[in-house]
Amino acid sequence: MARKTKEEAQRTRQLLIESAIQQFALRGVTNTTLTDIADAAGVTRGAVYWHFASKTELFNEMWQQQPPLRDLIQPSQVIEYEQEPLNALRERFIAGLRYIAANPRQRALMQILYQRCEFSSDMLSEYEIRQRIGFNYSLIGGILQCCVRNNILPAETNIEMILIVLHSAFSGLIKNWLLDPQRFDLYQQAPALVDNIMAVVCAARLSGGPALRLVNQ
């Protein structure tokens, strides 16, 4: 019986987290109360306090349990990084954009991060959250280094500069789409969007065209 009670408590805790995601995305973190979350979950406010001491604790737990986007996506083509690093990176970027476009929960999380949150000192910082769920500098930097080793990118390529530009480009793309999802179809246009970004910043020879590159000065 105790085991069942523990399982039920865990289900309630997860229900509160899912309800918080919905409410934060809808109302904004600042404007959402624990009563709003309790009502959305169909429980009492007291039940919320049994699991979380505050809205901030609930907010932090919501992000701490969220797996990185790279662990959630499934590229349409499985390409080995060592063999075709740039194409493998392309497929990962496309799969990431399509996952955000097609998955309501992930879209809600992106809305919270980019549009619905004013961070305070006791909350996980925006930087920490991005490091947890988003752009992985280490992974992508390793793939770009592999491109250099395979002579896909020139030896003088400035990897750090490419990482900065890629991160800025994809963050801006997602932010703009969230502001007006009807303006363009992120899911359908993901391949073209990725190809254009990569062609500008990392000499993407994906279509046989001339290479552009950012190099060390």
Report residues per predicted region:
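Amphipathic alpha-helical segments enriched in hydrophobic/aromatic and basic residues
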Residues: 24, 33-34, 45, 55, ...
